[in-house]
UniProtKB/Swiss-Prot annotation:
List of catalytic residues: H694
The protein's name: 5-methyltetrahydropteroyltriglutamate--homocysteine methyltransferase
Gene3D superfamilies: 3.20.20.210
Organism this protein belongs to: Campylobacter jejuni subsp. jejuni serotype O:2 (strain ATCC 700819 / NCTC 11168)
Record-level GO BP terms: methionine biosynthetic process; methylation
């Protein structure tokens, strides 16, 4: 029995990659220094994986920003607007990631989307000229040879042709048609080069196969691979899937020329049933994904061994594998000195998952009962308490009316118009303002008990004063307090709710250099005291204008945390919803007129198969949001915000959230959402996001005016809010102030024309 992993986290044990890239962005280091830091990290990771006894060690899973972009660049799928900048390869790569504004031109970044049902974001490759598609990059070969120099025969990992093709945004059908042919030739050339290098295994990741596949999808997949696999020669090909099962294509794969199939037995609800029904091919190896690549709880070896035993009825050719890339979990528990060992022993981050694979291999390769198995089973005895009877009783007492807000949206809109007295096209921001180094050091000093609570509060109050003053000077209509007390929109609430645990160093890559530290939902969740009330009251006391209360919604808190596995996601979310509901009512009682409840991650856990959308997610996720705000008065305006996602197909469900105003992150997707909003007569007021805050570009008044006009061409003016597309925490103040001034100027200009 051998073992494997799909991919390893690339940010480093202490986010070394993030800091190295940011240094380069700030012109504080050279290209050579950045590339050396990246190479050092790769070497460290390979040696770590090798030391852990992993047989199939991945290469080309490393990325300076995003692995989808890496695949696109490898095959020269680069939009002309980036080519025309005439930058060197590295800066052209980063121009696609972040946009570019300088002497060579002014271009926006590629659109960003959620990577399937995870909190990782990938960049959407754009193709306007298929003629140039060819194997022009060498990253995959270089990194294979780097590993080879260390004595490691690695397994290069690359996004498969079918998934890559499905993720590309093509200019038109003609471009797409030509791209199909050119991309196939480029992959064939890739196979030839890997054969020249005498590479043994190539892993092609095809996660798109876990969606509902149409007949056309299956035909396209077969068209690609029937040709491609004829060119594999001595190269062995592993078709790797994750985030679900292969029910639409599994029987066909058994008859294909792939040398191995990677199946996900964690999220693939039907993976085992498919093997039981159709068996497994004698000429193939099964890479069995049984170590959870998405959650941080320790593997129960008894369950894994039971699964392997069942699979061995159908094939003896099994490689132990992770369910998906380990990119989605933190690096290692060895950096967690503050978490009680009674909890920590039950966690396995990326490095610990390597150990689990090593243990399982050893247990399966030994004849008598192994002490490693006994030690693992001991972990699950004497688990710390998770239950809270008060929370259970409160959930049990919920009635149907607790999930419905009255009066109707139409009636509320009239009441709020009279009560709030806002101008046409009201301007606002999404919530957070830039967090400078002094804000972060003040928070750290307070956490480390180096300053008093009073000093900490006074510092933040001063920051709030400055933030309110800046917004008033700019001329925004609805203000925010800036969120200087918050490290992260989910972690902050988790820290103030009972039932959560926190890591010191549990960083996970969200996109590019952005890393998040998800909390762990350990037990039943409740609110023991107000969380944001004092900050919101203080901010509102500083201005005659409305200052929004800012909260994170229950579905986002759940989706951006590591969830419990002992109760349903529905129950966990309802517990969080009741806690946030208490906060909403406190804010309203304190005179806060607009309360924003962000559901940035609503789309995130939507099942990948449409048939499961309602029964497994939306039927409880939407009511959980309703539970949070159903108790407020008609005059209180409820806002929500949603991040990078595709919403077109769930807009009716979003409307059913019954918020009064919804802001979307739509600027990177060229506001394509507007047509759908118009088509379904979306009733909620909307702020589609008029510029992209994930890029350092400052939009001009002209650019913003055109965007606002574009929105007005699609939606009634009474329905529109003007705002950036996300919070401003990661930007610099000079960018923010100029951008917001331009936003207000553009809005005033448009108002005069209406």
């Amino acid at each position: 029995m051998k073992n494997s992993i799909i991919s390893y986290p690339r940010i480093g044990a202490n986010r070394e990659l993030k800091f190295a890239i940011e240094k380069y962005f700030k012109n504080q280091s050279s290209k050579e220094e950045l590339l050396k830091s990246a190479k050092d990290l790769r070497i460290r990771h390979w040696q770590e994986i090798q030391k852990a006894g992993i047989d199939f060690i991945p290469s080309n899973d490393f990325s300076l920003y995003d692995n989808v972009l890496d695949a696109a660049v490898l095959f020269n799928i680069v939009h002309t607007k980036y080519k025309n900048l005439n930058l060197d390869a590295l800066d052209e790569y980063f121009a696609q990631s972040r946009g570019y504004q300088g002497e060579n031109g002014d271009v926006t970044a590629l659109a960003m989307k959620k990577w399937f049902n995870t909190n990782y974001h990938y960049l959407v490759p754009e193709c306007d000229n298929a003629d140039i598609i060819a194997l022009t990059g060498d990253k995959i070969f270089k990194e294979y040879l780097e590993a080879k120099e260390l004595g490691i025969e690695s397994k290069p990992v690359l996004i498969g042709i079918f998934t890559l093709f499905k993720l590309i945004a093509f200019k038109d059908e003609k471009t797409q048609k030509l791209a199909k042919e050119k991309l196939l030739n480029a992959y064939i050339e890739l196979f030839d080069k890997l054969n020249e290098l005498k590479v043994t295994w190539l892993e092609l990741d095809e996660p798109y196969l876990v969606y509902d596949l149409s007949k056309e999808d299956i035909a396209l997949f077969e068209e690609f691979y029937q040709e491609l696999l004829n060119h594999k020669k001595d190269l062995k090909i592993l078709l790797q899937s994750y985030f679900g099962d292969l029910r639409d294509i599994y029987p066909k794969l058994l008859e294909s020329k792939f040398d191995a199939l990677g199946l996900d037995f964690i999220e693939g609800k039907q993976s085992l049933a498919l093997v039981q029904q159709y068996g497994f091919a004698k000429d193939k190896i099964l890479f069995g994904g049984l170590i959870n690549g998405k959650n941080i709880y320790a593997n129960d070896y008894a369950k894994s061994l039971k699964l392997i035993k069942e699979l061995q009825k159908y094939t003896q050719n099994i490689i132990l594998n992770t369910s998906c890339s380990l990119l989605h979990v933190p690096y290692s528990t060895e950096f967690e000195s503050k978490l009680d060992s009674s909890y920590l022993k039950l966690f396995a981050f990326a490095k610990e998952k390597l150990q689990e694979l090593k243990d399982l291999k050893e247990i399966l390769n030994s004849s008598e009962e192994n002490p490693l198995f006994r030690a693992n089973q001991e972990l699950f005895k004497n688990i710390p308490e998770r239950l809270d009877e008060k929370v259970k009783a409160r959930l049990k007492a919920l009635k149907k009316e607790d999930f419905t807000r009255t009066p109707s949206f139409k009636e509320r809109a009239l009441i709020q118009k009279e009560f709030l007295k806002l101008p046409l096209l009201p301007t606002t921001t999404i919530g957070s303002f830039p967090q400078s180094a002094d804000v972060r050091s003040n928070r750290l000093a307070f956490k480390q008990e180096k300053i008093s609570a009073q000093n900490y509060t006074e510092f933040n109050q001063q920051k709030i004063k400055e933030c309110i003053q800046i917004q008033e000077e700019i001329g925004l209509d609805v203000l925010v307090h800036g969120e200087f007390e918050r490290n992260d929109m989910v972690e902050y609430f988790g820290e103030n709710l009972k039932g959560f645990l926190f890591t010191q160093n549990g960083w996970v890559q969200s996109y590019g250099t952005r890393c998040v530290k998800p909390p762990v939902i350990w037990g039943d969740v409740s609110r023991t005291k107000p969380i944001t009330l004092a900050w919101s009251k203080f901010a509102q006391s500083l201005s005659q204008k409305i200052v929004k209360g800012m909260l994170t919604g229950p579905v986002t808190i759940l989706n951006w945390s590591f969830p419990r596995e002992d109760i349903s996601l529905k129950e966990s979310t309802e517990q969080i919803a009741l806690a946030i509901r208490d906060e909403v009512l406190d804010l309203e009682n304190a005179g806060i007129k607009i309360i924003q409840i962000d559901e940035a991650a609503l789309r995130e856990k939507l099942p990948l198969r449409k048939s499961d959308w309602h029964s497994e997610y939306l039927d409880w996720a939407i009511p959980a949001f309703n539970l949070v705000h159903s108790g407020v008065k008609a005059k209180t305006q409820i806002h929500t915000h949603m991040c990078y996602s595709e919403f077109s197909d769930i807009l009716k469900e979003i409307d059913a959230m019954d918020a009064d105003v919804i802001s979307f992150e739509a600027s990177r997707s060229n506001l394509s959402l507007l047509d759908t909003l118009k088509a379904i007569r979306f009733k909620t007021e909307v702020g589609p996001g008029v510029y992209d805050i994930h890029s350092p570009r400052v939009p001009s008044v002209e650019e913003l005016s055109l965007t606002i006009e574009k929105i007005l061409n699609k939606l009634p003016k009474e329905q529109i809010w003007i705002n950036p597309d996300c919070g401003l925490k990661t930007r610099a103040y000079e960018e923010v102030i100029t951008s917001l001034k331009n936003l207000v100027t553009a809005t005033q200009k448009i108002r005069e024309q209406l």
